Amino acid sequence: MFKKLFLFLFISSLAASVSAQLKSKAQSFFSPRYTFQIPGGDMSDRFGLNSSLGLTFATKKENGTYFGVNGNYQFGSDVQEAGLIQNLLSVNNEIISVEGKPASVLIQQRGFNFSVDFGKFMRFTNSKNESGILFTIGTGFIQHNIRFEHQLDDIPQLDGEYEKGYDRLSNGLMLSQNIGWLFFSKKRFGDFYLGLELIEGITSSRREYNFDTLTSDLGDTRLDLLFGIKAGWVVPFYKKNLYD
């Protein structure tokens, strides 16, 4: 579903902008960004809706050629992994601390990814600003795991090496496709990016054994999908060159 939607948006925007392309001006910039992400594939069996914060360093040439590098930190609080820590729960579905009392455990999603992107910037003919549609594809690395936080309680079952038996650490190659609107204003601090992103992570579990389910999925291939809505502030390095 995500791939069909992304392909439709990509083709529609391409058809609308090819005839409206102007020569662009070269520009390098960095961009802090936020992405709201909807999981798909194997990722949706483990996590729900989540977010990422990232930073992009990029350059676009006069012919519209785009090159960028990205790093993103992923986080979320909707963990849906089946059987997670089931062996640690009491008959009342509580985890008991070393003090013999019910403990408070915050279960969260954590992860990161980084990639190298290539693409094309197409400027609009009717735009008085240096703005247009940006298409990119990229490749890189993605990793995610489950994090257990229990600062107020002592739970040795979820500390150190024991935690590795529950955290479902997975990582591997990622591919990405992006389509968005890159806008450079004549006004200072008025530049931004809005877009859609599809990430395909071809990952594998890196833990030998899951203590809670008494199973091993070490080396099993996963297809982790993330469909994202991305927004970012764009900071050019030499903005005065855009409108000389």
Segments (PLM) and residue ranges:
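Residues on the lipid-exposed face of transmembrane beta-strands in outer-membrane beta-barrel proteins
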Residues: 32-34, 55-59, 71-73, 114-120, ...
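Sequence/structural signature of outer-membrane beta-barrel proteins
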Residues: 35-41, 76-78, 121-125, 144, ...
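Sec-dependent N-terminal signal peptides
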Residues: 4-14
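Extracellular/periplasm-exposed beta-strand and loop segments of Gram-negative cell-envelope proteins
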Residues: 41-46, 78-111, 144-172, 203-212, ...
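N-terminal signal peptide c-region/cleavage motif recognized by signal peptidases
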Residues: 15-19
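Predominantly the C-terminal beta-signal and adjacent terminal strand-loop region
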Residues: 177, 183-244
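Short glycine/proline- and aromatic-enriched beta-strand/turn motifs that initiate or cap beta-hairpins
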Residues: 20-70, 74, 232, 236, ...
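Short loop/turn motifs that connect adjacent beta-strands in outer-membrane beta-barrel proteins
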Residues: 21-27, 63-64, 124-132, 184-192, ...
